[in-house]
């Protein structure tokens, strides 16, 4: 079982990374800068396990900062700990998406708008590709050893999950949706970016494409400045106030 979030002697640094990774997991994460990260399953993903099968997407993870999950970010702790609050499993952090266009395409596919006919055509194309992939993978499985066969089984499980999502989306394809054009990319200002991401988040819930979501307004140790309100210095440095509260 995952260990509760009790501080350990000698690990006083890395507080920012530990804060984000503990927020929805409630565990004390493993101190590492490498790929051997370990936290715990987050609350949103526990909920997604229960209600996510009924929607096209089990969950949606959004952010406003760029959110890498590789490398070191905070005093010996991996960037995965600082840059996401959603963990599918103790070793699988879910990257938070900060590009409105990518979020739109995840919700509605590579269409220009939420138009029902365009969505259905895209779904049928996706299904055709998955049918081909599944057939090829099943044929390959018969020639593999036990270890490789196990890995391929995990891959096929993921493919079947995508197939389930497509089937759910096809059943919902004729549903009326608010008119929403595909975003071009990340807006120039923080205010515009935040509003667009909130609009997409709301749209995902309104259309029942998902019922579970997380939104990380700023990653830990963010250097974002806010010139719109007269703050030209980075948030993290300003928050310390020269260590003089």
Predicted regions and their residues:
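Ligand-binding pockets and gating/stacking loops
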Residues: 1-245
């Amino acid at each position: 079982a995952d260990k509760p979030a009790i501080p350990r002697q000698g690990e006083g640094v890395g507080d920012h990374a530990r804060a984000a990774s503990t927020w929805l997991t409630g565990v004390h994460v493993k101190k590492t800068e490498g790929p051997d990260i370990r936290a715990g399953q987050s609350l949103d993903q526990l909920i997604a396990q229960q209600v996510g099968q009924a929607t096209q997407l089990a969950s949606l993870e959004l952010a406003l900062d760029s959110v890498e999950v590789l490398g070191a970010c905070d005093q010996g702790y991996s960037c995965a700990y600082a840059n996401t609050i959603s963990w599918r499993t103790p070793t699988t952090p879910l990257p938070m998406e900060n590009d409105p266009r990518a979020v739109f395409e995840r919700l509605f596919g590579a269409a220009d708008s939420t138009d029902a006919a365009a969505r259905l055509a895209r779904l049928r194309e996706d299904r055709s590709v998955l049918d081909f992939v599944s057939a090829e993978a099943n044929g390959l499985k018969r020639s593999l050893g036990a270890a490789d066969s196990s890995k391929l089984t995990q891959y096929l499980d993921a493919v079947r999950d995508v197939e389930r999502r497509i089937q759910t989306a096809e059943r919902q394809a004729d549903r009326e949706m608010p008119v929403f054009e595909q975003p071009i990319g990340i807006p120039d200002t923080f205010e515009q970016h935040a509003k667009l991401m909130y609009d997409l988040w709301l749209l995902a819930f309104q259309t029942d494409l998902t019922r579970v979501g997380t939104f990380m307004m700023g990653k830990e140790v963010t250097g974002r400045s806010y010139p719109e309100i007269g703050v030209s210095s980075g948030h993290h440095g300003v928050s310390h106030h020269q260590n003089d509260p």
